[in-house]
From Swiss-Prot:
Chain intervals for the UniProt region annotation (Disordered): 1-23, 279-306, 403-440, 619-686
Organism: Gallus gallus (Chicken)
Transport is among the record's keywords: no
Residue spans, zinc finger C2H2-type: 315-340
GO molecular function: DNA-binding transcription repressor activity, RNA polymerase II-specific; RNA polymerase II cis-regulatory region sequence-specific DNA binding; zinc ion binding
Composition bias, Acidic residues: 676-686
Organism phylogeny: Eukaryota, Metazoa, Chordata, Craniata, Vertebrata
Protein name, entry field: Forkhead box protein P1
Name of the coding gene: FOXP1
Amino acid sequence: MMQESGTETKSNGSAIQNGASGGNHLLECSLREVRSNGETPSVEIGAADLTHLQQQQALQVARQLLLQQQQQQQQQQQQQQQQQVSGLKSPKRNDKQPALQVPVSVAMMTPQVITPQQMQQILQQQVLTPQQLQVLLQQQQALMLQQQQLQEFYKKQQEQLQLQLLQQQHAGKQPKEPQQQQVATQQLAFQQQLLQMQQLQQQHLLTLQRQGLLTIQPGQPTLPLQPLAQGMIPTELQQLWKEVTSSHTAEEAASNNHSSLDLSTTCVSSSAPSKTSLIINPHASTNGQLSVHTPKRESLSHEEHSHSHPLYGHGVCKWPGCEAVCEDFQSFLKHLNSEHALDDRSTAQCRVQMQVVQQLELQLAKDKERLQAMMTHLHVKSTEPKATPQPLNLVSSVTLSKTASEASPQSLPHTPTTPTAPITPVTQGPSVITTTSMHNVGPIRRRYSDKYNVPISSADIAQNQEFYKNAEVRPPFTYASLIRQAILESPEKQLTLNEIYNWFTRMFAYFRRNAATWKNAVRHNLSLHKCFVRVENVKGAVWTVDEQEFQKRRPQKISGNPSLIKNIQTSHTYCTPLNAALQASMAENSIPLYTTASMGNPTLGNLANVMREELNGAMEHTNSNGSDSSPGRSPMQAMHPVHVKEEPLDPDENEGPLSLVTTANHSPDFDHDRDYEDEPVNEDIE
């Protein structure tokens, strides 16, 4: 069957050749007769004859192609019937058989001749002499001979591939990689020869056009883009197009299933170059236009790269410290590869640039933090007297109205978390709420862990982990809570002193500076707190946490006036009781406690001023030496008196809010950084 199909295709090619040569022979005879009579060729008669001849040639080519397609379909049907009856052939061979019998493409079957319309234009323009017409016919014959040689070469190559595939199938062995590579190289060489032949034809037609033998209108496509002659019936064209497209789809499906490079990919028309040919030679095309446009596309791509490259701008190299002038992007690439190669100097410059970027990122984080604080501040001013968000759980604003003061002793502060807000320095200890008006109470600073009376949890740090790692802000936790958290996060629930230091510096950017200050505080807290237990093991001395002892220190003792206890019970979630030392100081100075009954007293502001002066007077005799129990404040006061800090008041309010920050160092219930004995609490407070 394969040999029969090969002989049929050869006979078809010879028929096409005879038809085309016969048409050209008739044209030559007519021209010789005209020349022998000594007459000039008539434009009308010559155009009609040429049109008729070209239509005859095109019809012959189309009919031959249709007949070939029908014969191949019949052969395939017969083969399928034989395979169903005998059942001897494998399904793989059945799948490969349609792919092997590939029809010759339309571009191969149709000679690249001049269309009737173009020949008519040549005759109407009367620019060709009989000698020029004879030369043109000779050139057309040479083109047809080239086409025939190309077809024969194509058929030979296809027969060789069929024989190789049949031998491999009969042997029952898969082709090895060297054989596959050899077949692939042969196919590539064949495709390159096809492209070279098409390029030669294209160049020949272009030379004819340049010599003035052919004229193409601006709206008319180029010569190779002309499919069949335009004298065919539209129904025949549609049928021919359907046959060709169906054969191409079948060939592509077969080639995809077998994942083998088949010659069917080359069987496309001259107007649509194959993908493999484009991959082999991207600068070659059947219409000769791709090679003209590819340099422009490359130049455009280089321009885009030059605009987008971060190291090149305005003709200057943007490498740090270089600023070399480069004429174009190509010279810049050469300069980049030669001057800035991978060496010690480039590596050092890259490290410097990394440090610059890190500093800029830190500065950006600070600027963002400042912007957030400004926005928060403006938001606070615009929403007064409502409860407003304050920076990072450190400040709580308490608002008391007249109705609220009558209904409850104190209103509940509102402290939403704003992790991007700035951190303000605070001091440890309970806050004393002193009201100078019936309408509001100023912001009260207190420590997060003291305010909520719960130990630090991993969720508190994990929630703002990235913020603490990048921003140099003071974490709102005591050193004892941070040390406990570091030990609990370790796998063995024990850490050496150096490992505790490393945890501090790894989790908080604030501790990467001033190491001497906070490391001393960590050592003092480890030695003074009973909840931290030192254990000797193989590594050396490690520190563990006694949770029971740590939890014993957390609950706060409530003592003093029953009215104070009542107030604390009503607002125990957010408010803390007065310090015992503060109560004793108030009792000595005969300052009554502020309850709901005394809030309406008109002399409340005077009493608050007296208490503030008395407490601030005791501050002058304190000793500033001692260990710092919080990363966010100055060292603790080791003496008994209490330090009260006055918050700035609003200038436009006569009776503005008063907020006091107290630091009580004698009570272990509030001081989680020192271990002192409980002092006797004065119970005679009125």
